[in-house]
A protein has these predicted regions:
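N-terminal secretory signal peptides and thylakoid transit peptides that target proteins
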Residues: 1-19
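Transition segment at domain starts
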Residues: 26-62, 96-98
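Short edge beta-strand/loop segments characteristic of extracellular beta-sandwich folds
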Residues: 70-76
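An anionic, turn-rich surface loop/hairpin at beta-sheet edges
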Residues: 89-114
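Extracellular Ig-like/FN3 beta-sandwich strand-entry sites
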Residues: 115-119
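Short acidic/polar inter-strand loop motif in beta-rich domains
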Residues: 127-133
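Short beta-strand edge segments in extracellular beta-sheet folds
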Residues: 136-142
């Protein structure tokens, strides 16, 4: 193999391997490490989200196993660019945060881990405003070491 081609391939491979680290730089360690939902939201700059029926949460009312609880979330609020999922009674309440480009469908389907019966709260951000909706899920067998 030509040495120049080998160097080019190695440089391209290194660039691809380092790309995931750029995503880690955006991770908010303080928010995801917060022990209360209020502290996590405060760290994210979310003050008082307004209740909204335009955030749809589809989840089971009762989860037999808290280790895998399926949830679907969709925001019908125009201009939604961020969805944040908070599980109030988990050891680390901030579960996930999704960012969408303008015009994208703000929809996610995920499996979450729940330690006990808790409210699952979703905060949608559209422009400078925040909106929230929640649903309680009863857990019979905890998934966070319970």
């Amino acid at each position: 193999m030509d040495p120049l081609r080998r160097e080019t391939l190695l440089a391209a491979a290194a660039a691809l391997l380092l790309r995931p680290f750029a995503a880690l730089a955006a991770w908010n360690k303080e928010a995801f490490g917060a022990k209360s939902a209020a502290d996590a939201l405060k760290t994210l700059g979310i003050a008082s989200p307004a209740p909204s029926k335009d955030i749809v949460i589809e989840a089971p009312q009762i989860a037999e196993n808290g280790a895998v609880v399926p949830i679907e979330i969709q925001s019908n609020i125009p201009g939604t660019t961020v969805l944040t999922v908070v599980i109030e009674k988990n050891p680390f309440p901030l579960n996930s945060r999704f960012t969408f480009r303008e015009g994208a469908l703000p929809f996610v389907k995920l499996n979450v881990k729940m330690g006990e019966t808790s409210a699952v709260r979703v905060i949608a951000q559209a422009g400078a405003r925040s909106y929230t909706a929640s649903q309680e899920i009863k857990v019979t067998i905890g998934g966070c070491g319970g």
